[in-house]
Design a protein with these regions (language model features):
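Membrane-interface "cap" regions at the ends of multi-pass membrane proteins
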Residues: 1-51, 64-68, 76-80, 88-89, ...
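Helix-loop-helix junctions that connect adjacent transmembrane segments
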Residues: 11-12, 163-239, 243-296
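Extracellular loop-to-transmembrane helix junctions
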Residues: 17, 39-142, 247-251, 257
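TM-loop-TM module centered on a large, flexible mid-protein loop between adjacent transmembrane helices
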Residues: 92, 123-128, 196, 243-311, ...
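C-terminal membrane-solvent junction of multi-pass transporters and transport-like membrane proteins
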Residues: 160, 334-343, 381-432
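Small/aliphatic-rich secondary-structure junction motif
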Residues: 481-535, 551-553, 557-562, 610
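Structural beta-alpha unit
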Residues: 554-585
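Glycine-rich, Arg-bearing micro-motifs that act as flexible, cationic patches
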Residues: 587-610
């Protein structure tokens, strides 16, 4: 087996329906990306102070570069997986795993940080005493609620997302326009747009400003949400770039505008300390008029959009896990479906616990969660930019429905977009800022990364697949294939001198989480009454059923036991099958019973012919 490539054959399954248009895609993307301003603005102001608008503008420029990279890559490879998928095509499965694992951390922290920001905005609507432990408790309750909702399988509505996006955009635009025409103190804001000026009010030094810019990057993460939905998008070549450009333009303008308005009514120090948990509600609450009515409205809007963002993070975890599991990058049991609700309950439970763990570890510190967020997100973004650059060089003739603009020609039909170069350098720089200046995010981030890589190596070796190669999936169509389901297994508890049939039945019932019934049939000759006394046979039958019960206990199964009298085993089994919903009958036999003229062989033939369910014979 080569370590460079490996082919795995899978069954062809129904593909996701392409139902999302540009408007729905924009709404879902905006709901994920647009929620970040509600906690990122305060974090940015904490470091960037009066230069917060500049930090947001620089982060916005990087976001635009990243968005254009995703527009090209998601249309070239319209599959789930985002940066993990891009890296798999450009590099190999190990690099793809690192990108996906970083993105998975990003999604988990999205759940944690979005849910944690909700109580701070809710208290603007319904005032309650401030307490970090109470906020953590409410956050844990919100995350658990989202877990239950996702396990039950409540569907996310694209139309609801679109409506919420419209309401949010109108509300944020109103804030910017109202301030612009009525009370915006632009000279005051401009006077504080200074960096590294000693003695100037609210002027950060260059180190603080770089940290502030890194925090501002948190406001723009989430563009992966659109790439993850590429497989469900109508006409992805047109729809994805359009939705990404709408998201890009709307967010950059509104975020910059809100930061300018904010610094007109609140000094940067208060915005980054006193109001760090709910900066947007604080801004409208400090308006010279209408603030006490506007603040609760924005508190409610923020809480709803943050709840949707947290839910999107949990959904993103399961989607990404499914995509990575298809390529054997994470254990496939992670997306095993719930027997009743048909949802990936195991992966949802694991990510719920991890999100709650991050909230508890943070001890109510948004900064810690933001650092961890940046650690994972910048790995994903950097890998996306590098994937574009590598594929532009290695495969210049690859079909690209959309190409990022502003290209530098490199000869032989090759070119590199300036936007991808800027994006790659910027995202790597932000990641290094987290690594060298944020010990909390760095330590937990590297722990996550190392544990993931070890798991990946172990899993790939266990599956005898290459670690650094490029796994390719070949799908084949088998029309007659249908997933087998077993809900109730019937096993004949015969006295044979072996337990093969009982063990087989128990193993199948355990695997399919099915009920199991064991029956022992006392055969009564036609010449005798059906209730004729056969004490010895009854004792043997009870002993056989006890053996069946003991074996079932070894498989942690609860077993139903039946002792019946009948003329033939075949007749008793057929009568039982007719009266109960059995999917499978398991019967143990001895070699000599298969002789052509034996009475048992004839019974076997009749059972096979007449049974309405599957019949399995175990010959010892």
């Amino acid at each position: 087996m080569s370590d460079s490539s490996e082919r795995v054959v899978h069954l062809e399954k129904k593909s996701l329906k392409r139902v999302l248009g540009a408007a729905e895609l924009f709404a879902i993307g905006y709901g994920d990306v647009g929620s970040s301003i509600y906690y990122a603005l305060g974090l940015t102001a904490l470091y960037a102070l009066g230069a917060t608008p500049i930090a947001l503008a620089i982060a916005g420029l990087v976001f635009m570069c990243t968005s254009l990279t995703y527009a090209e890559m998601a249309t070239t490879f319209p599959e789930p997986g985002g940066s993990a998928t891009f890296s798999r095509y450009a590099f190999n499965d190990l690099i793809s795993f690192i990108a996906g694992w970083g993105l998975l951390l990003d999604y988990i922290v999205t759940v944690a940080i979005s849910a944690f920001a909700i109580p701070s905005y809710l208290k603007v609507v319904i005032p309650y005493p401030h307490s970090v432990s109470l906020n953590i408790a409410i956050t844990i309750g919100i995350i658990l609620l989202l877990y239950v909702i996702n396990v039950i399988g409540v569907k996310h509505s694209g139309r609801f997302s679109l409506l919420l996006a419209i309401v949010t955009i109108i509300s944020q635009a109103f804030v910017v326009l109202a301030a612009l025409f009525l009370f915006l103190n632009l000279p005051y804001v401009l006077s504080h747009l200074k960096i590294g000026v000693a003695g100037a009010d609210w002027s950060p030094n260059w180190g603080q400003f770089l940290k502030g810019t890194a925090m501002a990057m948190v406001a723009y993460t989430g563009i992966e949400a659109i790439a993850q939905l590429a497989a469900e998008t109508r006409k992805p070549a047109l729809t994805i770039p359009r939705a990404i450009k709408w998201t890009m333009g709307t967010l950059v303008l509104l975020y910059f505008g809100i930061s300018v308005v904010g610094l007109s009514v609140i000094d940067p120090h208060d915005l980054g300390t006193k109001y760090i948990d709910n900066p947007v509600a604080a801004i409208v609450g400090n308006f010279p008029f209408g603030g006490k009515w506007l603040a609760p409205w924005f508190g409610l809007i923020a809480a709803i959009i943050l709840l949707i963002a947290a839910n999107a993070g949990l959904i993103g975890c399961s989607r990404l896990t499914f995509s990575m599991g298809e390529y054997y990058q994470v254990p496939r049991f992670l997306y095993r479906l719930h027997p009743r609700f048909r949802t990936p309950h195991i992966s949802l439970a694991i990510f719920t616990v991890l999100a709650i763990g991050i909230v508890i570890l943070s001890q109510g510190q948004l900064l810690f969660m933001a650092d961890l967020y940046n650690f994972g997100a910048q790995i994903a973004f950097f890998s996306a930019h590098m994937s574009l650059l590598v594929l532009r060089w290695r495969k210049p003739s690859l079909s690209r429905p959309y190409k990022a603009p502003f290209n530098i020609p490199l000869g032989k039909n090759r070119s590199w977009p300036i936007t991808a170069l800027i994006g790659a350098m910027a995202t790597l720089t932000v990641w290094f800022i987290v690594v060298f200046t944020k010990p909390g995010g760095r330590n937990l981030g590297f722990t996550w990364l190392i544990c993931g890589i070890l798991m990946y190596f172990f899993y790939r070796k266990k599956k005898q697949l290459p670690v650094t190669g490029q796994l390719s999936i070949e799908t084949i169509k088998i029309p007659e294939y249908h997933p087998m389901e077993l809900k109730h297994v019937l096993v004949a508890a015969r006295i044979l001198g072996n337990t093969d049939a009982l063990q087989t039945a128990c193993q199948l019932a355990h695997s399919f989480k099915a009920k199991i019934t064991a029956v022992h049939v006392i055969e009564i000759p036609e010449s005798l009454p059906i209730h004729a006394p056969f004490l010895k046979r009854e004792e043997q039958g009870e002993a056989a059923l006890k053996r069946a019960e003991a074996i079932a206990r070894e498989y942690n199964l609860s077993i139903d036991l039946k002792l019946l009298r009948a003329r033939t085993i075949e007749g008793a089994l057929l009568e039982l099958i007719a009266s109960g919903a059995y999917d499978l009958v398991v019967v143990g036999t001895r070699k000599e019973e298969w002789a052509k003229k034996s009475s048992f062989a004839l019974e076997i033939q009749r059972l096979l012919k007449s049974a309405p369910c599957r019949v399995l014979f175990c010959k010892s």
